[in-house]
């Protein structure tokens, strides 16, 4: 839907501008973009937004291995997949940080797997610090204005 697309565009743009301003080398790919999590597996996921910092993982087909940062924007049909199935996959295969942006609940659930911490639930009105980028925080409500 429109809000889903707006969030993908705004989040991708914010991340891209930050990476460029820091002369970073990470790359951002919005869906459709295939992420092959297991070696020699034909199965893949298509996160709404993938941030990949190891360019050796990038191929013409997508990304082989876990992105550093993944954002999923919940749509009515993806709720269980985003909160359960993909959460387990991303944790198991080495994604460093995973956000579930839930417009219906106006909150973002943040998983920082490398810190082995409990998820943090942040309302859209509050800034969210990005674990892999120490100096960047994003307030989802501001992206929707």
What is the role of each PLM region?
Residues 1-145:
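Gly/Pro/Ser/Thr-rich low-complexity, intrinsically disordered segments predominantly at protein N-termini
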């Amino acid at each position: 839907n429109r809000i889903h697309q707006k969030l993908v565009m705004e989040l991708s743009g914010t991340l891209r501008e930050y990476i460029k301003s820091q002369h970073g080398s990470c790359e951002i790919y919005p869906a459709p973009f295939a992420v092959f999590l297991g070696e020699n597996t034909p199965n893949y996921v298509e996160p709404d937004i993938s941030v990949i910092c190891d360019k050796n993982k990038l191929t013409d087909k997508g990304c082989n291995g876990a992105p550093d940062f993944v954002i999923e924007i919940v749509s009515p049909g993806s709720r269980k997949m985003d909160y359960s199935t993909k959460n387990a996959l991303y944790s198991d295969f080495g994604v460093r940080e995973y956000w579930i942006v839930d417009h219906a609940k106006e909150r973002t659930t943040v998983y920082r797997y490398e810190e082995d911490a409990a998820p943090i639930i942040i309302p859209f009105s509050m800034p969210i610090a990005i674990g892999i980028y120490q100096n960047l925080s994003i307030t989802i409500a501001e992206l929707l204005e």
